[in-house]
């Protein structure tokens, strides 16, 4: 409450409000804050979201009252691969919400993807879909988190790394004038240049499948 009081008392100097998570559309204090912020055209509301909210979500509805909104969508695959990687999320709902936001004249969209063994091959497709079909203003690619060595793309087979590298180089050439995308892709290519021989990711996903009743090997047969 003290933070909300401080922000609202000093809101005339605000240039941007950044809502992240957890999932910001589920954090009740965000609604309390947003209701007290004037809907100024020179104030950017940035939102990082898993895109699983219902369209009548009160926080989403309050966000949409602002004239300048930027939604960053967490996208680690498409279709069944998205559903597998982002457990509990649903690709169809994601796209429904993306298209809902597309229809809002005050909203810009961008996407964020984690580069790891399960997204490496699909990354160019994901970028193209959001940049060309959705009209994203940008796309960020994050490296695999620390402590997740076994999920890093350096551990892919030489054959797959070669294919991924070729596709990423082509995608780099396509987006070379977008400094953020180009820089992120360069980092992905550098990751592929590292030596890695761990196949622990196979056991990692096998163990998840035992618990969840899923089958990563069916979705990614080339990695098995």
Where in the sequence are the language-model features?
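Core AdoMet radical
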Residues: 1, 11-28, 38-56, 64-95, ...
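Exoplasmic/lumenal beta-rich domain surfaces
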Residues: 1-2, 6, 157
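Alpha-helical packing segments of well-folded alpha/beta enzyme cores
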Residues: 3, 33, 94-97, 101, ...
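Distinct, well-ordered alpha-helical segments
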Residues: 29-35, 56-63, 122-126
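Catalytic cores of alpha/beta
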Residues: 117-133
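Flexible glycine/acidic-rich beta-alpha junction loops that bind and position SAM and/or redox cofactors
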Residues: 117-121, 137-166, 183-185, 192
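Radical SAM enzyme core and accessory elements
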Residues: 172-224
């Amino acid at each position: 409450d003290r933070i909300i009081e401080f922000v609202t008392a000093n809101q005339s100097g605000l240039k941007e409000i950044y809502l992240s998570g957890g999932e910001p559309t589920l954090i009740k204090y965000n609604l309390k804050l947003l209701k007290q912020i004037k809907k100024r055209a020179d104030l950017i509301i940035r939102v990082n979201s898993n895109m699983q909210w219902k369209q009548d979500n009160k926080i989403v509805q309050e966000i949409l009252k602002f004239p300048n909104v930027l939604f960053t969508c967490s996208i680690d695959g498409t279709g069944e691969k998205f559903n597998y990687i982002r457990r509990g999320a649903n690709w169809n709902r994601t796209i429904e919400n993306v298209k809902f936001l597309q229809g809002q004249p005050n909203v810009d969209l961008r996407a964020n993807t984690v580069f790891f063994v399960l997204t490496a091959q699909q990354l160019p497709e994901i970028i193209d879909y959001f940049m060309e079909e959705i009209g994203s203003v940008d796309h960020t690619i994050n490296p695999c988190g620390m402590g997740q060595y076994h999920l890093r793309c350096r551990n892919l087979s030489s054959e797959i790394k070669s294919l991924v590298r070729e596709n990423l180089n082509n995608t780099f050439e396509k987006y070379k004038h977008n400094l953020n995308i180009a820089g992120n892709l360069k980092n992905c290519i550098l990751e592929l240049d590292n030596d890695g021989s761990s196949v622990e990711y196979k056991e990692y996903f096998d163990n998840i499948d035992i618990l969840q009743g899923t089958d990563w090997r069916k979705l990614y047969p080339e990695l098995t």
